[in-house]
């Protein structure tokens, strides 16, 4: 069952509405960040969980530079759809 765009949640890395639920380890197809619950208050912390040694702050910087949470994810990402903005 697909969740409608209206009920989707914003990715903490790229900001697009691509996640079915917050903090549910959803993988964003736009930036390839896996939502582990990290937020602005701890964005510079490295949690060493599903995102490895990558902090949310680093992932955001990479996304701004290259369009993915890390350059190694570039083959997997896609552009955001208008409905995800």
PLM segments and residue spans:
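Short cysteine-rich clusters marking metal-coordination/redox-active sites
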Residues: 11-14, 28-31
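Short, non-ligating residues that shape and space the ligands of small metal-coordination modules
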Residues: 20-21, 35-38
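Compact nucleic-acid interaction/catalytic patches
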Residues: 27, 38-42
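Short, charged low-complexity linear motifs
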Residues: 12-21, 44-51
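Metal-centered catalytic cores of metalloenzymes
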Residues: 9-10, 16-18, 81-85
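Short, intrinsically disordered terminal segments enriched in charged and Pro/Gly residues
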Residues: 1, 41-85
């Amino acid at each position: 069952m697909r969740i409608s765009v209206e009920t989707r949640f914003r990715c903490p890395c790229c900001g697009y509405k691509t996640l079915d639920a917050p903090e549910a380890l959803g993988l964003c197809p736009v930036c390839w960040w896996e939502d582990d619950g990290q937020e602005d208050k701890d964005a510079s912390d490295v949690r060493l969980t599903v995102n490895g040694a990558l902090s949310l702050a680093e992932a955001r910087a990479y996304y701004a530079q290259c369009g993915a949470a890390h350059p190694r994810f570039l083959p997997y990402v896609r552009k955001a759809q208008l409905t995800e903005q």
